[in-house]
């Protein structure tokens, strides 16, 4: 009887520990807030909301997958470095192997407001600009991740 009670106590302890390893919505929101702060001061601030939402989810999923126990992530001394590494990985992935998704980082409307693209540019002209930009970026950076780090 004593062994059964001890066994039940151990099982209850293990189950309670495994349940506490999952991230709560509050913990996810804390990481999202950090990502939003990062977005405000980085080159990805021009991403459209839907694309940024996908990037945010990728980063959160990457970190949560690497650190299923939020407390271990929260206690990291290099927590910001971990976040930056996940960000670089996800942005590099979202740019694409041929830098075909540069418009996600640099939307044409933002480039027109900044005076980089003329306001009346046609779709063909905008596509030609992105093709040229992708070519120049490929000349300077071998991989999308290298380009992302440079941003």
Task: Give the ranges of each region predicted by the language model.
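Sec-dependent signal peptide recognition
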Residues: 2-7
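Mature extracellular/luminal domains of secreted and GPI-anchored eukaryotic proteins, especially small
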Residues: 19-151
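C-terminal motif of bacterial Sec signal peptides marking the signal peptidase cleavage site
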Residues: 14-16
